[in-house]
Amino acid sequence: MKFVDEAVIRVEAGDGGSGCVSFRREKYVPDGGPDGGDGGDGGSVYLQADENLNTLIDYRFERFHFAERGENGRGRDCTGHGGKDLILKVPVGTRAVDEETQEALGDLKTHGQKLLVAKGGFHGLGNTRFKSSTNRAPRQKTLGTPGEVRSLRLELMLLADVGLLGMPNAGKSTFIRSVSRAKPKVADYPFTTLVPNLGVVTPRHGQSFVIADIPGLIEGAAEGAGLGIRFLKHLERCRVLLHILDIEPIDGSDPVDSARAIVGELEKHSPLLASKPRWLVFNKTDLLLEEELQERVDRIVKELDWQGDVYCISAYNREGTQELALKLMDFIDALPPEVEEDPDAEVEFKWDNYHQKTQEVVNEDYDDDFDDDFDDDDYDVEIIYQR
Protein backbone atom coordinates (compact mmCIF):
# COMPACT_ATOMS: atom_id res chain seq x y z
CA MET A 1 0.00 0.00 0.00
CA LYS A 2 1.21 3.50 -0.80
CA PHE A 3 2.87 5.27 2.12
CA VAL A 4 1.10 8.57 2.90
CA ASP A 5 2.31 10.42 5.98
CA GLU A 6 0.25 13.62 5.75
CA ALA A 7 -3.40 14.43 5.07
CA VAL A 8 -5.76 17.37 5.63
CA ILE A 9 -9.33 16.59 6.71
CA ARG A 10 -12.36 18.51 7.94
CA VAL A 11 -14.22 17.24 11.00
CA GLU A 12 -17.60 18.47 12.18
CA ALA A 13 -19.04 17.52 15.53
CA GLY A 14 -22.81 17.14 15.85
CA ASP A 15 -25.01 20.06 16.86
CA GLY A 16 -26.79 19.90 20.18
CA GLY A 17 -30.54 19.18 20.10
CA SER A 18 -32.88 22.05 21.01
CA GLY A 19 -35.06 22.12 24.11
CA CYS A 20 -38.83 21.65 23.89
CA VAL A 21 -41.73 23.89 24.98
CA SER A 22 -44.50 21.59 26.19
CA PHE A 23 -47.15 21.41 28.94
CA ARG A 24 -48.92 18.58 30.70
CA ARG A 25 -52.21 17.69 29.08
CA GLU A 26 -54.02 15.14 31.23
CA LYS A 27 -57.57 14.52 32.31
CA TYR A 28 -58.53 16.38 35.46
CA VAL A 29 -55.36 18.48 35.22
CA PRO A 30 -56.55 21.54 33.32
CA ASP A 31 -53.51 23.66 34.17
CA GLY A 32 -50.65 21.21 33.82
CA GLY A 33 -47.17 22.52 34.39
CA PRO A 34 -44.32 22.61 31.88
CA ASP A 35 -42.90 19.26 30.83
CA GLY A 36 -40.62 20.12 27.91
CA GLY A 37 -37.45 18.05 27.92
CA ASP A 38 -33.88 19.00 27.12
CA GLY A 39 -32.24 18.19 23.81
CA GLY A 40 -29.42 15.69 23.43
CA ASP A 41 -25.74 16.56 23.21
CA GLY A 42 -24.15 16.41 19.78
CA GLY A 43 -21.69 13.66 18.98
CA SER A 44 -17.97 14.46 19.22
CA VAL A 45 -15.16 13.46 16.86
CA TYR A 46 -12.22 11.43 18.16
CA LEU A 47 -9.00 10.12 16.68
CA GLN A 48 -7.91 6.67 17.85
CA ALA A 49 -4.53 5.05 17.29
CA ASP A 50 -4.62 1.64 15.61
CA GLU A 51 -1.45 -0.46 15.37
CA ASN A 52 -2.87 -2.28 12.34
CA LEU A 53 -2.62 0.86 10.20
CA ASN A 54 0.60 2.28 8.76
CA THR A 55 -0.54 4.98 6.33
CA LEU A 56 -2.96 7.91 6.09
CA ILE A 57 -3.92 7.16 2.51
CA ASP A 58 -7.62 6.66 3.35
CA TYR A 59 -7.89 10.29 4.45
CA ARG A 60 -6.53 11.52 1.12
CA PHE A 61 -9.74 10.33 -0.53
CA GLU A 62 -12.25 10.82 2.30
CA ARG A 63 -11.72 14.29 3.69
CA PHE A 64 -15.06 15.24 5.29
CA HIS A 65 -16.25 13.56 8.47
CA PHE A 66 -19.41 14.30 10.46
CA ALA A 67 -20.65 13.17 13.86
CA GLU A 68 -24.37 12.75 14.60
CA ARG A 69 -26.60 15.60 15.74
CA GLY A 70 -28.36 15.40 19.10
CA GLU A 71 -32.13 14.90 18.97
CA ASN A 72 -34.51 17.63 20.11
CA GLY A 73 -36.28 17.33 23.45
CA ARG A 74 -39.90 16.18 23.63
CA GLY A 75 -42.90 16.50 25.92
CA ARG A 76 -43.42 14.54 29.14
CA ASP A 77 -39.91 15.50 30.19
CA CYS A 78 -38.36 13.31 27.49
CA THR A 79 -34.72 14.19 26.85
CA GLY A 80 -33.48 13.93 23.28
CA HIS A 81 -31.05 11.14 22.42
CA GLY A 82 -27.41 12.21 22.28
CA GLY A 83 -25.61 12.05 18.94
CA LYS A 84 -23.26 9.14 18.35
CA ASP A 85 -19.55 9.95 18.57
CA LEU A 86 -17.43 9.50 15.46
CA ILE A 87 -14.12 7.65 15.93
CA LEU A 88 -11.52 7.94 13.17
CA LYS A 89 -8.79 5.27 13.17
CA VAL A 90 -5.25 6.50 12.46
CA PRO A 91 -1.80 4.86 12.65
CA VAL A 92 0.16 4.94 15.90
CA GLY A 93 2.44 7.99 15.82
CA THR A 94 -0.09 10.38 14.28
CA ARG A 95 -0.09 14.03 15.33
CA ALA A 96 -3.16 16.26 14.87
CA VAL A 97 -2.64 19.96 14.12
CA ASP A 98 -5.34 22.63 13.70
CA GLU A 99 -4.84 24.08 10.22
CA GLU A 100 -6.15 27.55 11.14
CA THR A 101 -4.32 28.15 14.41
CA GLN A 102 -1.39 25.72 13.87
CA GLU A 103 -2.10 24.43 17.39
CA ALA A 104 -0.98 20.88 18.06
CA LEU A 105 -4.00 19.09 19.52
CA GLY A 106 -2.03 16.03 20.55
CA ASP A 107 0.00 12.95 19.60
CA LEU A 108 -1.24 9.37 19.50
CA LYS A 109 1.72 7.25 20.59
CA THR A 110 0.11 4.06 21.90
CA HIS A 111 -2.39 1.59 20.50
CA GLY A 112 -5.96 2.43 21.48
CA GLN A 113 -5.17 5.96 22.63
CA LYS A 114 -7.99 8.42 21.86
CA LEU A 115 -7.86 12.15 21.20
CA LEU A 116 -10.84 14.53 21.16
CA VAL A 117 -10.50 16.83 18.13
CA ALA A 118 -14.03 18.29 17.76
CA LYS A 119 -16.45 18.62 20.64
CA GLY A 120 -20.17 18.08 20.14
CA GLY A 121 -22.61 20.92 20.71
CA PHE A 122 -24.28 21.34 24.11
CA HIS A 123 -27.96 20.45 24.38
CA GLY A 124 -30.66 23.08 24.56
CA LEU A 125 -32.85 23.40 27.68
CA GLY A 126 -36.58 22.67 27.76
CA ASN A 127 -39.13 24.97 29.36
CA THR A 128 -39.21 22.82 32.50
CA ARG A 129 -35.86 24.37 33.39
CA PHE A 130 -37.37 27.88 33.48
CA LYS A 131 -40.32 27.31 35.83
CA SER A 132 -40.45 29.40 38.98
CA SER A 133 -42.95 30.70 41.51
CA THR A 134 -43.54 33.76 39.35
CA ASN A 135 -43.45 32.01 35.99
CA ARG A 136 -45.47 28.81 36.29
CA ALA A 137 -46.05 28.45 32.55
CA PRO A 138 -42.73 29.35 30.95
CA ARG A 139 -42.49 29.40 27.21
CA GLN A 140 -38.75 29.83 27.11
CA LYS A 141 -36.33 27.30 25.76
CA THR A 142 -32.77 27.35 24.46
CA LEU A 143 -31.42 26.02 21.21
CA GLY A 144 -28.63 23.51 21.02
CA THR A 145 -25.22 24.95 20.22
CA PRO A 146 -23.42 24.11 16.98
CA GLY A 147 -20.76 21.41 17.11
CA GLU A 148 -17.08 22.21 16.78
CA VAL A 149 -15.75 22.41 13.21
CA ARG A 150 -12.04 22.01 12.54
CA SER A 151 -9.69 21.60 9.63
CA LEU A 152 -7.02 19.14 10.77
CA ARG A 153 -3.63 18.29 9.39
CA LEU A 154 -2.74 14.72 10.26
CA GLU A 155 0.98 14.02 10.36
CA LEU A 156 2.27 10.47 10.69
CA MET A 157 5.59 10.44 12.53
CA LEU A 158 7.34 7.11 12.87
CA LEU A 159 8.14 5.87 16.36
CA ALA A 160 11.78 4.79 16.37
CA ASP A 161 14.73 4.85 18.78
CA VAL A 162 17.47 5.35 16.17
CA GLY A 163 17.30 7.43 13.00
CA LEU A 164 19.60 7.27 9.96
CA LEU A 165 20.84 10.41 8.23
CA GLY A 166 22.97 10.71 5.15
CA MET A 167 23.38 11.51 1.49
CA PRO A 168 21.79 9.28 -1.17
CA ASN A 169 23.79 6.08 -1.71
CA ALA A 170 25.62 6.44 1.61
CA GLY A 171 24.52 2.92 2.54
CA LYS A 172 21.68 3.62 4.97
CA SER A 173 19.35 0.97 3.54
CA THR A 174 22.19 -1.55 3.37
CA PHE A 175 22.95 -0.88 7.03
CA ILE A 176 19.36 -1.42 8.15
CA ARG A 177 19.29 -4.68 6.16
CA SER A 178 22.49 -5.83 7.87
CA VAL A 179 21.26 -5.30 11.45
CA SER A 180 17.56 -6.17 11.13
CA ARG A 181 15.17 -8.26 9.07
CA ALA A 182 13.88 -5.23 7.19
CA LYS A 183 14.40 -5.51 3.44
CA PRO A 184 14.36 -2.01 1.93
CA LYS A 185 15.25 -1.70 -1.73
CA VAL A 186 18.98 -1.32 -2.43
CA ALA A 187 20.39 -0.23 -5.79
CA ASP A 188 23.33 1.69 -7.26
CA TYR A 189 21.47 4.92 -8.07
CA PRO A 190 20.46 7.89 -5.90
CA PHE A 191 17.11 8.05 -4.11
CA THR A 192 16.47 4.33 -4.19
CA THR A 193 14.65 4.85 -0.90
CA LEU A 194 11.53 6.92 -1.53
CA VAL A 195 9.65 6.32 1.73
CA PRO A 196 10.80 5.73 5.32
CA ASN A 197 11.54 2.17 6.43
CA LEU A 198 11.54 0.66 9.91
CA GLY A 199 13.56 -2.24 11.24
CA VAL A 200 13.70 -3.96 14.63
CA VAL A 201 17.25 -4.64 15.83
CA THR A 202 17.82 -7.38 18.42
CA PRO A 203 21.49 -7.26 19.44
CA ARG A 204 20.92 -9.42 22.53
CA HIS A 205 18.24 -11.85 23.60
CA GLY A 206 15.35 -9.93 25.14
CA GLN A 207 16.69 -6.53 24.10
CA SER A 208 15.68 -4.64 20.97
CA PHE A 209 15.23 -1.19 19.50
CA VAL A 210 13.63 0.27 16.39
CA ILE A 211 15.67 1.94 13.67
CA ALA A 212 14.28 4.27 10.98
CA ASP A 213 15.73 4.81 7.51
CA ILE A 214 14.56 7.89 5.60
CA PRO A 215 15.29 8.99 2.02
CA GLY A 216 18.66 10.66 1.53
CA LEU A 217 19.23 14.39 1.89
CA ILE A 218 21.18 16.64 -0.46
CA GLU A 219 22.30 20.24 -0.24
CA GLY A 220 19.36 22.57 -0.78
CA ALA A 221 16.80 20.07 0.51
CA ALA A 222 15.23 22.80 2.67
CA GLU A 223 14.43 24.67 -0.56
CA GLY A 224 12.95 21.55 -2.15
CA ALA A 225 15.97 19.96 -3.81
CA GLY A 226 15.80 16.19 -4.16
CA LEU A 227 12.95 14.84 -2.06
CA GLY A 228 13.12 17.86 0.25
CA ILE A 229 13.09 17.61 4.02
CA ARG A 230 9.51 16.42 4.53
CA PHE A 231 10.73 13.06 5.83
CA LEU A 232 12.93 14.60 8.53
CA LYS A 233 9.90 14.82 10.82
CA HIS A 234 10.09 11.03 11.19
CA LEU A 235 13.34 11.49 13.12
CA GLU A 236 11.92 13.90 15.69
CA ARG A 237 11.02 11.10 18.09
CA CYS A 238 14.33 9.26 17.71
CA ARG A 239 16.64 9.26 20.71
CA VAL A 240 19.89 9.13 18.77
CA LEU A 241 20.81 9.83 15.14
CA LEU A 242 23.38 7.95 13.07
CA HIS A 243 25.02 10.15 10.44
CA ILE A 244 26.07 7.63 7.77
CA LEU A 245 28.99 8.97 5.73
CA ASP A 246 30.32 7.36 2.55
CA ILE A 247 34.08 7.17 3.08
CA GLU A 248 34.73 6.69 -0.66
CA PRO A 249 31.99 8.43 -2.70
CA ILE A 250 31.70 7.12 -6.24
CA ASP A 251 31.32 10.66 -7.61
CA GLY A 252 34.60 11.77 -6.03
CA SER A 253 32.97 14.32 -3.72
CA ASP A 254 34.53 15.26 -0.40
CA PRO A 255 32.82 13.56 2.58
CA VAL A 256 33.48 16.70 4.64
CA ASP A 257 31.31 18.81 2.33
CA SER A 258 28.61 16.14 2.40
CA ALA A 259 28.60 16.03 6.20
CA ARG A 260 28.39 19.81 6.50
CA ALA A 261 25.52 19.92 4.00
CA ILE A 262 23.53 17.38 6.00
CA VAL A 263 24.07 19.25 9.27
CA GLY A 264 23.06 22.52 7.59
CA GLU A 265 19.79 21.05 6.30
CA LEU A 266 19.12 19.56 9.72
CA GLU A 267 19.52 22.93 11.43
CA LYS A 268 17.29 24.64 8.87
CA HIS A 269 14.52 22.15 9.48
CA SER A 270 14.62 22.01 13.26
CA PRO A 271 17.25 23.22 15.75
CA LEU A 272 15.74 20.79 18.25
CA LEU A 273 16.37 17.88 15.90
CA ALA A 274 19.90 19.11 15.24
CA SER A 275 20.60 19.11 18.99
CA LYS A 276 19.81 15.39 19.40
CA PRO A 277 22.73 13.01 20.11
CA ARG A 278 24.41 12.23 16.80
CA TRP A 279 27.04 9.62 16.00
CA LEU A 280 29.30 9.74 12.97
CA VAL A 281 29.44 6.40 11.12
CA PHE A 282 31.87 5.87 8.23
CA ASN A 283 30.51 3.28 5.81
CA LYS A 284 32.10 1.31 2.94
CA THR A 285 35.40 1.06 4.80
CA ASP A 286 36.18 -2.16 2.90
CA LEU A 287 37.00 -0.04 -0.17
CA LEU A 288 40.18 1.34 1.44
CA LEU A 289 43.32 -0.17 2.89
CA GLU A 290 43.64 -0.01 6.65
CA GLU A 291 46.33 2.71 6.72
CA GLU A 292 44.57 4.82 4.09
CA LEU A 293 41.28 4.41 5.92
CA GLN A 294 42.67 5.66 9.24
CA GLU A 295 44.31 8.67 7.58
CA ARG A 296 41.08 9.65 5.85
CA VAL A 297 38.98 9.20 8.99
CA ASP A 298 41.40 11.35 11.00
CA ARG A 299 41.34 14.07 8.33
CA ILE A 300 37.54 14.18 8.12
CA VAL A 301 37.11 14.21 11.90
CA LYS A 302 39.65 17.03 12.20
CA GLU A 303 38.11 19.17 9.44
CA LEU A 304 34.63 18.70 10.87
CA ASP A 305 35.93 19.41 14.37
CA TRP A 306 33.88 16.41 15.43
CA GLN A 307 33.75 15.78 19.19
CA GLY A 308 31.22 12.93 19.30
CA ASP A 309 31.35 9.19 18.75
CA VAL A 310 32.96 7.84 15.56
CA TYR A 311 32.48 4.33 14.13
CA CYS A 312 33.77 2.57 11.02
CA ILE A 313 31.66 -0.14 9.37
CA SER A 314 31.09 -1.98 6.13
CA ALA A 315 27.34 -2.53 5.96
CA TYR A 316 27.64 -4.69 2.84
CA ASN A 317 30.07 -7.12 4.51
CA ARG A 318 28.49 -6.64 7.95
CA GLU A 319 31.82 -5.60 9.42
CA GLY A 320 31.41 -3.61 12.63
CA THR A 321 27.62 -3.54 12.38
CA GLN A 322 26.97 -5.90 15.28
CA GLU A 323 29.35 -3.98 17.54
CA LEU A 324 27.59 -0.74 16.60
CA ALA A 325 24.18 -2.27 17.36
CA LEU A 326 25.39 -3.34 20.81
CA LYS A 327 26.73 0.17 21.50
CA LEU A 328 23.38 1.64 20.48
CA MET A 329 21.50 -0.76 22.74
CA ASP A 330 23.66 0.16 25.73
CA PHE A 331 23.28 3.86 24.96
CA ILE A 332 19.48 3.66 24.71
CA ASP A 333 19.21 1.63 27.92
CA ALA A 334 21.29 4.22 29.77
CA LEU A 335 19.09 7.12 28.69
CA PRO A 336 16.53 8.40 31.22
CA PRO A 337 12.90 7.61 30.41
CA GLU A 338 11.19 10.12 28.17
CA VAL A 339 9.03 12.68 29.94
CA GLU A 340 5.43 12.20 28.93
CA GLU A 341 3.24 15.15 28.12
CA ASP A 342 0.79 16.23 30.81
CA PRO A 343 -2.25 14.01 30.27
CA ASP A 344 -4.45 16.55 32.07
CA ALA A 345 -3.58 19.33 29.63
CA GLU A 346 -6.63 19.70 27.42
CA VAL A 347 -7.34 21.75 24.36
CA GLU A 348 -9.87 24.54 24.87
CA PHE A 349 -13.00 23.96 22.86
CA LYS A 350 -15.59 26.47 21.75
CA TRP A 351 -18.44 25.39 24.01
CA ASP A 352 -16.51 24.34 27.13
CA ASN A 353 -18.12 27.05 29.31
CA TYR A 354 -21.56 27.06 27.71
CA HIS A 355 -23.16 24.71 30.22
CA GLN A 356 -21.96 26.73 33.20
CA LYS A 357 -23.05 30.08 31.75
CA THR A 358 -26.50 28.78 30.79
CA GLN A 359 -27.07 27.29 34.23
CA GLU A 360 -26.13 30.60 35.87
CA VAL A 361 -28.78 32.39 33.83
CA VAL A 362 -31.40 29.81 34.81
CA ASN A 363 -30.46 30.00 38.49
CA GLU A 364 -30.95 33.77 38.54
CA ASP A 365 -34.66 33.27 37.82
CA TYR A 366 -35.10 30.26 40.08
CA ASP A 367 -36.90 30.58 43.43
CA ASP A 368 -35.66 28.20 46.12
CA ASP A 369 -39.00 28.45 47.97
CA PHE A 370 -40.92 27.10 45.02
CA ASP A 371 -42.06 23.48 45.11
CA ASP A 372 -41.09 22.10 41.72
CA ASP A 373 -43.16 18.93 42.17
CA PHE A 374 -46.07 19.46 39.80
CA ASP A 375 -48.59 16.88 40.98
CA ASP A 376 -52.36 16.91 41.03
CA ASP A 377 -52.50 18.29 44.59
CA ASP A 378 -51.05 21.57 43.40
CA TYR A 379 -54.29 22.34 41.62
CA ASP A 380 -56.93 21.11 44.14
CA VAL A 381 -57.05 24.41 46.03
CA GLU A 382 -58.90 27.30 44.48
CA ILE A 383 -57.31 30.62 45.24
CA ILE A 384 -59.69 33.49 45.77
CA TYR A 385 -58.48 37.03 45.64
CA GLN A 386 -60.31 39.58 47.79
CA ARG A 387 -60.21 43.30 47.30
From Swiss-Prot:
EC class (word): hydrolase
PROSITE patterns: G_OBG (PS51710), GTP1_OBG (PS00905), OBG (PS51883)
Residue ranges constituting the Obg domain according to the UniProt record: 1-159
Cofactor(s) required, per the database record: Mg(2+)
Keyword Kinase: no
Cellular component aspect of the GO annotation: cytoplasm
Example GO biological process: ribosome biogenesis
Domain OBG-type G: start-end pairs: 160-333
Broad class of where this protein is predominantly found: cytoplasm
Pfam families the record matches: GTP1_OBG, MMR_HSR1
Binding locations of GTP: 166-173, 191-195, 213-216, 283-286, 314-316
One Gene Ontology term of the molecular function aspect: GTP binding
Record's subcellular location: Cytoplasm
Keywords associated with the record: Cytoplasm, GTP-binding, Hydrolase, Magnesium, Metal-binding, Nucleotide-binding
Binding site for Mg(2+): 173, 193
Enzyme Commission numbers on file: 3.6.5.-
InterPro entries xref list: G_OBG (IPR031167), GTP-bd (IPR006073), GTP-bd_Obg/CgtA (IPR014100), GTP1-OBG_CS (IPR006074), GTP1_OBG_dom (IPR006169), GTP1_OBG_dom_sf (IPR036726), OBG_GTPase (IPR045086), P-loop_NTPase (IPR027417)
HAMAP family membership: GTPase_Obg
Chain's role: An essential GTPase which binds GTP, GDP and possibly (p)ppGpp with moderate affinity, with high nucleotide exchange rates and a fairly low GTP hydrolysis rate. Plays a role in control of the cell cycle, stress response, ribosome biogenesis and in those bacteria that undergo differentiation, in morphogenesis control.
Subunit structure: Monomer.
Family indicated by similarity: Belongs to the TRAFAC class OBG-HflX-like GTPase superfamily. OBG GTPase family.
Protein name (database record): GTPase Obg
Native source organism of the sequence: Shewanella loihica (strain ATCC BAA-1088 / PV-4)
